[in-house]
Each structure stands twice: as C-alpha cells, then as structure tokens.
Regions:
Chain B
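Bacterial N-terminal signal peptides
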Residues: 10-19
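Sec/Tat signal peptide C-region and signal peptidase I cleavage site
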Residues: 22-26
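C-type cytochrome heme c attachment motif
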Residues: 103-115, 163, 167-171, 185-194, ...
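Acidic, glycine-rich loop-and-strand cores that form catalytic or ligand-binding grooves
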Residues: 184-235
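Extended, hydrophilic extramembrane loops/domains of integral membrane proteins
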Residues: 241-243, 249-284
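Juxtamembrane interface at the cytosolic side of transmembrane helices
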Residues: 290-293, 302-320
C-alpha cells in the first residue's frame, strides 16, 4: 500500500534534494497520499492523539528538567520551586503530570479499540507487538517519573515496585540492590530514575517510529475488519480526510486534557505525594497511579510473592500473544456477537480490578480481586482460543465500500 | 462516519450526569457518616465498608472511650463541605480573608508549624496582597539566620528582608525539637492544604471530576474540619474528624483567641475558615492565574474544535 510515492518536486532545488534524500517524498507518501480505509470511526484518531501526547510530554519534560533537582534532600522543594517561582512552571508541571494520565487514557482507548476490532490479527502481528513494547516502556517511564517529585507516594511506590524484583529466586536481592544503587531507595535511586526517565521517552519515540512504519506497510485495520480490496473504492487519502478527522479528535481530547490541567489538576494524584518522602513513615495506604491499578490488584490478589510478580508481568505479556491466542478468522467484533459480550465483560473486569487496586486490602476485596484476576486470565487463555472454534459469526461485507453503503451513508456524489 | 443520533444523545447524558452530581452535593450537606456505605452495588466491591464498620466497635473496646462522644467513636464522619471563595470555575481568593488567615498563622499556627514561603509572596495581588511596605515591616520583625557567615566567620542573625523564607518557629528551630514535645513533628504548612484529603468513595469520586460539580477542595474541608473537630471537652487531643480520633496536636484555637480588626466575629468557625483559606493560597498560589488561563484555553479549544468539525464535515461530504 505504501512505497508508491507519487511525489514530484516542483522546483529544481526540490528535485536536486529529492534525488539525494527522498524525505519529502517519504512524508508525502506516508501522510498525504497514504490510503486510509474510508470507514474508520473516531476510535482511530487515538494514534494521532498519542503521537501528540508523546511530543507534549517530551517538550514539557525537557522544560521541567531545566528547573528540577534530582537530589533526595532537594527534589521535593525543587518541584515546589517550579510550581511557585518558575514562570509558567505550574503550567508545565500540571501539563506534564496530567499529561501522563491523558497519555494512558489515550493508550487504553487505543488498545481496547485494537482488541475490539481485532487489529492484532494477520498481517498486523508485528505492528501489535511493537505497540505492546511501547506500552511497557510507557509504564516504566511513568513509574520512574512518579518517583521524581520525591513525595511519600513516590518513595513508597518505588519501594513496593523495586521490591518485586527481590521475588526472583537466588539473584533477587542482588538485582534489587543493583537497581537501588544501595541497600534501600535513596539518592542513588533517585538519580538513576531521573536519568532513565529522560532516556526512555526517546526509546518510546524510536519504537513509535517502527510502529508507524509497520502500520504503513500493512495498512490500517478498520471497523469492518475486511482488508482493502480496491484502493479507489475502499480508501480515501490521508490528507485531507484523516488529517482533519484526527485534528478534530485531538481538539476534543485537548478539551478534556485542559479541563484536568486547569480545573482539577490534583484530582488524579494522591494527596500524600505532597508530603516529602520519609523512609521512617509508611503511608497508611500505598497506591500506584490509576493507570497501574489493575495490575497492582492482580499482584495483591496472589498470596505467593513470586507467583504474584509472575502474574503481574504475565498479565501484560499476554497482550503480546493475542494474535495467536485469538483463533477466530473474523477480525471485527461487529461480526462476532459472542466475542462482543466477552469484550465488554473484559473491559468491566479491568475497571473492576482497577477499583479493587485502589482499595485497602480486606478479605472481601482480596476474594473479589482473585475472582476478577481469574477472569482476566481466562479471557486470554480460555475464551479467546475457544471462541474462534465455536462462535457463529455474522457474514462479512464483500468490501469496505459495501459496508459503508450498507450502513446507509448517502451515496449522492461519486468519489472525487 | 458521524452518527448524528449519538451526538444528540450527548447533551442528554450530560444532563443526567449533572443531576447525579447535584444529588452528590445534596448528600454532602447532610452530616451523615461516610456516604459510600449507602451505595447499593451488589458486587463484592462494596463489601469492605460494612465489614469495616462491624470491626470498628471491637477495635475500640480496648481503648478508653470519651464519655460525651461514645456514639461518634465508632464512626468516622466525613468533613462537612464548606463553601470556599476559591472553588468552581471562577473561584479566587478573598484578600481580606487571607490577611485574617495570615494573622492567625502568625499568632497561633506559627508557634509550632513552619511555613516555608518567602515573605515577598505575601504581596501576591491575587493572594493576601499586602503592600511592599507592609511586607518589609513584617519581615523585619523576624530574626533570620544569615545564609553565610560574617567576615569574622561567625554565623549571625539579622532582621528579615522580603526575599527571606519565613523562618522556623523560635521555640522549635528544627523538626526534631517539635517532635520531642508533641511526639510527632508539626508538618510544614506550605503545601499542607494539598497534602490532606479524605476518602470520597464510590461513586462520589467520579462526580468530583466532572464540570459544574467539580470538587477539588477536599484538603481545605479536611483542615477546617480538624480545627473545628475538638468536640470532646474532657480530652483536648480527641478530634472528631481525625482518622482514629487521637491527634498529636492539642486544640490550637478557640473563640476569641485572635483579635479581628475588620469586624468579623472572633468565632472558631471564622478562624477555621480564614486560616484554611490562607493555607490553601499558600499551597496553591497560582490558582487564580491557572483558572484565568484555563478559561481562555477552554474557549479557544471549543471554538477551534467546532471549526475543525465544520471543515471536516465539509471535506468529507464530498466523498459520501
């Protein structure tokens, strides 16, 4: 679908340059004439939104790093210095801290959209796995970023997560000491987390490049899950069609983002993180940021520490195996009535796990978390493999164009 | 594809949410114990609340219960919701209130609590708004330890200047000294209002994030509640709203403790309101600028999104 660049430079200089580095042609073929299925809905705007959020996080983060002090006795006050004394420091900091949440909100929409419409299925397996790697890198980046303000929840969250590594048999303790740069979380840990928090976003950007590259090789999936058969009939040009749609989606997303930044900037954060880190005072209730809560609930639900850690990472790793766990040849949930029910149950399951992860541990929450964790794994390991064998799917449309016409869109004028 | 019937549903959904939000407010007004227990959800999720309530009386049997509050002992009421000038879309600080609040900090809280902000910030026009001369005079009443020694190599004290941080209390120059007296160090008050909360519980925490019913002032309500929560005359360190009720800080302020010169009645509730508002400003001095900027950003984004939608619709109309 791509690679067929139709770009013709208009000026002599443009031709000279294009013969030496065809980068304008690359942009032209990737973001101007690139064929986009014409039936995409607004769930497909999250790719552009995520690209924007990555850039926004890097830009605000670079500015914050100019004023932040990664030193354990000064980190907390340096964040307050940014909030009070730096011009628009409060804006940069609230954009960055809420930006992390918005980034995850968008990535969860993106991932659930991928699951609903079977976007991981052939030929998009590599594209999907690259996405899972980005998600993992995002979680590592967000976790280390949350440590930097050096509040109580930063410190104790870091304690809980780094202690997970001590569960590894034989070498666990050594690994944890290596991670900490000492025998406990301290200045050395803060320093390396700052360094890595600055590094990882650029690694994400690199993998995003591969993700987009892979996307432009195999083309986008679409709500009907049938591949493009006739480029003329089934697709529209990326620009202006997808560009404008993405721009509108992004603008609406920015309204939500701005709402959080300007009116409820501390809603998603924990109040305890405005208390300076104190290794001698354990908070009554240690909770990670909301986007990690479902995994935290799975971790706490398992009584054995090593097994808990295995399940925690397994819950994420399973995503990478989705292309082979889902045995159904039909991609879109639109034509899979039973899968659709299980999908929404899975979404509810994840939200339920998230809520349980935010609650204090009691017998009933542990029981509920075990039940929901079991359902989480069952969705991947039992439901998806079996559904493909037994589910009676609805007939697929012959082509994307047929699906569009069938859904009652007015076909007044022919395509351009 | 744009589905118009879905778009038409959106305002209806918003209306339902707002109505629910209003209900959540009505609930706040009633001085009932923690609301989430009333949420009728059949899932296991709500189970912990009754379990906790059942466990609480047992836990209290060992401890001596204060006589006139035995009924309250088992429950932990949520702080009653106050109306703050700095809440809502256009909320800002009330200058006179912050000035009264600063007076209370200076005469009462400042005896034990640090407030690590520079004197100069007290001239913030959207905050307490003291004049430059007032700040200079105020700073000079404090003795500040100089950062560097003098030419004889001696550490010395000098009168404060506006760029100095408000120095720690004379009686407790370091946190350890205060901890030795009270058993716990009095927290620095500069971000206190953002560092305190109470659990809102399901489903109220959802409404707290929504436009028009947003609720960001949990920390302020908590501090106000603590200051007015010393309701047991026999035990000065018993607080109705403190988790577990036993608080290290003995009742700090009561009626007539601070003289008001602007005619505001010298009542505990007014003191609590004023000093809490002051502490909220100290924790979030950029709130007014933030909300003002936010309004412009919102108007821009909504208009911009609307225009983009129209352009998008026009361009896409060609291919339908």
């Amino acid at each position: 679908m791509s690679g067929s660049s139709t770009y013709v430079p208009k000026s002599a200089l443009g031709r000279w340059f294009e013969n030496r580095l065809p980068i304008v042609g690359l942009v032209h073929s990737s973001f101007v004439v690139f064929p986009v299925p014409r039936n995409l809905n607004y769930m497909w705007t999250f790719g552009a939104i995520l690209s924007f959020m990555l850039v926004a996080q890097i830009v605000t983060g670079v500015v914050l790093a100019m004023h932040y002090t990664p030193e354990s006795t000064m980190a907390f006050s340096s964040v307050e210095h940014i909030m009070r004394d730096v011009n628009y420091g409060w804006l940069m900091r609230y954009l960055h801290s809420n930006g992390a949440s918005m980034f995850f909100l968008a990535v969860y929409m993106h991932i659930f959209r991928g699951i609903y419409y079977g976007s991981y299925k052939a030929p998009r397996e590599v594209l999907w796995i690259l996405g899972v790697i980005i998600y993992l890198l995002m979680m590592a980046t967000a976790f280390m970023g949350y440590v930097l303000p050096w509040g109580q929840m930063s410190f104790w969250g870091a304690t809980v997560i780094t202690n997970l590594f001590t569960a590894i048999p034989v070498v666990g303790k050594s690994v944890a000491i290596w991670l900490w740069g000492g025998y406990a979380i301290d200045n050395a840990t803060l320093n390396r987390f700052f360094s890595l928090h600055y590094l990882l976003p650029f690694m994400i950007a690199g993998v995003v490049g591969l993700h987009v590259w892979a996307l432009h090789v195999v083309g986008q999936n679409n709500p009907d899950g049938v591949e493009v058969k006739n480029v003329e009939r089934d697709t529209v040009a990326f620009t202006p069609y997808a560009t404008l749609k993405d721009a509108f989606g992004l603008a609406v997303f920015l309204i939500v983002y701005a709402w959080f930044v300007f009116y409820i900037p501390n809603y998603l954060g924990d109040a305890d993180n405005y208390n300076n880190a104190n290794p001698l005072v354990t908070p009554a209730h240690i909770v990670p940021e909301w986007y990690l809560l479902p995994f935290y609930a799975i971790l706490r639900a398992i009584p054995n520490k090593l097994l808990g850690v295995v399940c925690l990472f397994g819950a994420i790793a399973l995503l990478a195996f989705l292309p082979w766990l889902d045995t159904s040849p039909v991609k879109s949930a639109k034509y899979r009535p039973v899968f659709r029910v299980f999908f929404w149950a899975f979404v509810a399951d994840c939200i339920g796990l998230g809520w349980l992860g935010s609650q204090e541990v009691s017998d009933s929450t542990t029981l509920a978390a075990r039940l929901l964790a079991f359902c989480y794994f069952a969705f991947f390991l039992v439901v998806l493999p079996l559904l493909g064998l037994f589910e009676k799917t609805k007939p697929l449309p012959a082509s994307i164009a047929d699906a569009v016409l069938a859904s009652g869109a007015p076909a007044a004028q022919p395509a351009e | 594809m744009i589905r118009f019937k879905n778009i038409a549903l959106a305002p209806a959904a918003v209306a339902v949410l707002l109505a629910l939000g209003a209900v959540s407010r009505a609930d706040d007004a009633a001085p009932a114990p923690a609301a989430p227990a009333a949420a009728p959800a059949p899932s296991a999720a709500t189970a912990p609340t009754p379990a906790k309530a059942a466990a609480a009386p047992n836990a209290n049997q060992g401890a001596p219960t204060p006589g006139d509050n035995a009924a309250d002992e088992a429950s932990q009421p949520s702080p009653p919701r106050q109306s703050w000038s700095f809440s809502g879309f256009f909320g800002g600080y009330d200058q006179a209130q912050l000035q009264r609040g600063f007076k209370i900090y200076r005469e009462i809280c400042g005896n034990c609590h640090r407030l690590s902000i520079p004197f100069r910030t007290l001239s913030d026009p959207s905050g307490p708004g003291f004049s430059e001369a007032q700040i200079k005079a105020l700073a000079a009443t404090y003795q500040v330890t100089n950062d560097t020694p003098n030419d004889k190599g001696e550490i010395f004290k000098r009168p404060g200047i506006p760029s100095d941080l408000i120095p720690p209390p004379d009686a407790y120059p370091n946190p350890e000294a205060a901890a030795a007296t009270f058993g716990k160090e009095p927290p620095d008050m500069w971000v206190l209002a953002k560092a305190r909360k109470y659990e809102r519980g399901f489903p109220w925490f959802i409404f707290d994030a929504l436009p028009f019913v947003q609720y960001q002032e949990v920390g302020a309500d908590y501090i106000h509640a603590i200051l007015t929560g010393y309701t047991n005359s026999k035990d000065p360190s018993w607080n109705l709203y403190f988790p577990g009720h036993k608080i290290a800080m003995p009742q700090p302020i009561a009626d007539d403790a601070v003289e008001y010169t602007d005619g505001t009645p010298a009542k505990l509730d007014n003191y609590a309101q004023d000093v809490t508002a002051f502490l909220y400003w100290a924790a979030e001095p950029t709130l007014v600028e933030r909300k003002k900027t936010g309004l412009r950003v919102m108007i821009f984004l909504i208009v911009f999104a609307g225009l983009l939608y129209l352009v998008k619709k026009k361009v896409w109309a060609k291919i339908h």
